[in-house]
Structures are given as C-alpha cells and as structure tokens.
UniProtKB/Swiss-Prot annotation:
Domain of life: Bacteria
Taxonomic source organism: Streptomyces coelicolor (strain ATCC BAA-471 / A3(2) / M145)
Record-given protein name: GTPase Der
Complex and partners: Associates with the 50S ribosomal subunit.
Amino-acid positions noted as binding GTP 1 in the UniProt annotation, renumbered to this chain: 33-40, 80-84, 142-145
Amino acid sequence: MELAAEEGFDIEDVEGAIEEAGHGPLPVLAVVGRPNVGKSTLVNRIIGRREAVVEDKPGVTRDRVTYEAEWAGRRFKVVDTGGWEQDVLGIDASVAAQAEYAIEAADAVVFVVDAKVGATDTDEAVVRLLRKAGKPVVLCANKVDGPSGEADASYLWSLGLGEPQPVSALHGRGTGDMLDRVLEALPEAPAQTFGTAVGGPRRIALIGRPNVGKSSLLNKVAGEDRVVVNELAGTTRDPVDELIELGGVTWKFVDTAGIRKRVHLQQGADYYASLRTAAAVEKAEVAVILVDASESISVQDQRIVTMAVEAGRAIVVAYNKWDTLDEERRYYLEREIETELGQVAWAPRVNVSAQTGRHMEKLVPAIETALAGWETRVPTGRLNAFLGELAAAHPHPVRGGKQPRILFGTQAGTKPPRFVLFASGFIEAGYRRFIERRLREEFGFEGTPIHISVRVREKRGAKKK
C-alpha cells in the first residue's frame, strides 16, 4: 500500500479494486415461471440492459443464458429460464424441466407469476418443485401497474411462498423493492482466500454439443464397478451427480443426467442443452470439453468453449473419435484448432477414443494440470519484478503524446487467477493480451483463463465530486 500512496492512488480505491477482483464465484439467481409471464423482461430490468431474449419461443438460440448483475453494490449472476412454449412437451413438463435445471445451480430463485391471470395449475406445479428444492424464493407478482394490480397480487399469498412482491417489469415499478428481497435471499459472494482447500471431491463438468460422445466417454471412465455413488442430490427423475474413481482419486462428475439421458425434443432442444450446460458449468471447478474430431469444429463448439471461459472454470479439451481420423483429417483438424479454438490454446489437450478407451489414462493428468493452473498464486514481489522487466523491454505504445505506464500490480484472487494492474493511463486491449501471454510464459497458468483488470490513476490534484 505504500507503493500505491507513492504513485498517487487513493488507498481506499486500491483496496476496493483488489476486494472487487478478489471475490470467489458470484451467487446465482434463477428467474423461473411459466411462459409469457415476463421473465425475460424482468431479467433485462435486473441486469440493466436489453440483452435477454424477450420472446418466449422454443428454439430461440441464445449464446448465453447467464448474465451478471449488480444491485446496491453487490454483484450476482442471473440465469434466465425463458424460452418455452406450450407445445414443446406439454406445459407442465416443459416448465418443470427448465425450472429444475436452473434451480439446481441457483442459490436463490425469483418465481415470476402473472398477477393479472393469477395462480394457475402450472404455477402450483412449480411451487411444489420449489418446496422440494429448498432454495430461498422471492415471489414476483408481475404486470402490476397500479392499485388494482396490487389487489390482484395479494391473492398470490395463497401460493404459500410468503409476501408477493408487486412489480411491473416493463415499467420498472417495484423492481427495487424486489431486488432488496433478492439480496436478503442470496448469500454474499465469498471472499477469495489463497490456498483454501476445496471440500470434497473435485467437481468436473463433461460438456459438449449433442452426439459428440459424452455418454460413451462417461461410461468408459466410470464402468459399473467404479461408480462409487450413483444417486447424489438426485432430481425428481434422474441422478444429477456421480462420484467416479479415476487414477486412484475420487472425482465428482456433475449433471451426468444430462449426459446419460438423451434428449429428444422436436423444438427447444438447443436451448434445453445450453441451459443444462450452463448449470453444469456453474457447479463445476473444471470443464472437460468434448469435441468430435471427425467433424469440423462448429459454432456450437465455440459457444460451449466461450461459456466455460466466461464462467472462469479450469478447462481441458478432449478430442474424441481420434482413432477414426486419417492423415488428411488430422492435418485439417490442427488448422481448425488454431483458427477456431485459439482462445483456449492454453488448455491441456487430450486425443481420445470413448469407444476403444484410447488415451483415457491421459485425462486425469490433464485435469490435474488445469486445476493446478487455476489455483496458481504469484507473490506480489515477483509479479512486480516481472511487470517492471516487461515494461522496460516492451513499453506500452505512445498514444496522444503520452505513454501509459504500469505502476504496480497484485494478484487479487485465484480460481481463476485475477490480477489488478494500477497504471498512469489507459492500457489498450492489445497490450493487455500481450501481458497475459507473457504471464503465461513466465508463470504457467496452463488450463485456466486469466482475468486482468486495470485501474487508472486520477490526475494529481483532481478532486472527487
């Protein structure tokens, strides 16, 4: 902190920046309810921008179903569970399915009901699901635009979920009071502590687009004699997590139901899969991304990779069906990996065959490598010596007659590694990427995303208003 003061930074600002970057995983809020009650409109209101899809139609493709939000200085993630229509599986089944996977990954739930329509049989079915899950619930009575609407909302006491929060998601009425209740229900984001041991078996999400061989791979690594526990935290229909022994160590594979139970839906299958993948990634520490090496790398493959990176998980990429490739396909696959999956060039890679079991023994070392990178901590003194040498050898380009300097830096957290750099001016994105590359060359960080945030020193003498 002495260095911060010498360089003209406000100590409180520095401490705040480090604390903000150093939090562990953010708490998760799921927004659930039947179609057309205004879930996506409410999500847009919560996150403060028009980003969620506002049509409740099955088959609407979304790159993301998880968004980051902030209220009263606290940050959290919002899972939007919109996107289902009555003719997907029958309304009860479709709502129960999408709600169940979101609730599984959530710390608290906002249950949205149309106050004008009142409680329906479908709403009652969701209430039963919420009671079974045991998660904190905030009941949102939406489409309340005035006193008559508040009277409608009061009827929702009958659901037995406590006081209904009268809200108009469209106009913003009542959303502040509702979010205050949400903060009461959500746990605080855990502070980051270096070297904290993770309780229980390490958690793995096996993810990938449909039909890449996830089921075959899971069966191959598990084997009936090696499944330690089959139904942990089971949902109403099928097991969610499985404990599997690999390399003499027990690992928890999360949401194996989504792998073992093949989903055959005429509509909404992509959305169903992406929601399920997002929920699995949220619960995991490491994502093993399975790619079908016999086919061209698809946009969906890239989306799944991006989802895991943005979630900040340790990552291993496994290329399945490797034994089926001829020399020509291997050549073109290498080119595709360079161009399409360059964003995870740092991730350990294993070439496997779920069918024959080829190279399965390489999976555990790759996972362990990724977790080690994910938990790597660089001492502050060593980090600043590295930054000083880097800036001396490769200074930031001059812009507008000025050359921004990195004054000092610190690692605010791990899982994934998060760094805060304090600078005399704006640091361009290209230079940040250069710093990340050199950090990886110097300290490893194999198998993990790295987050770098920059705080710029205010001009000396500038008064805060």
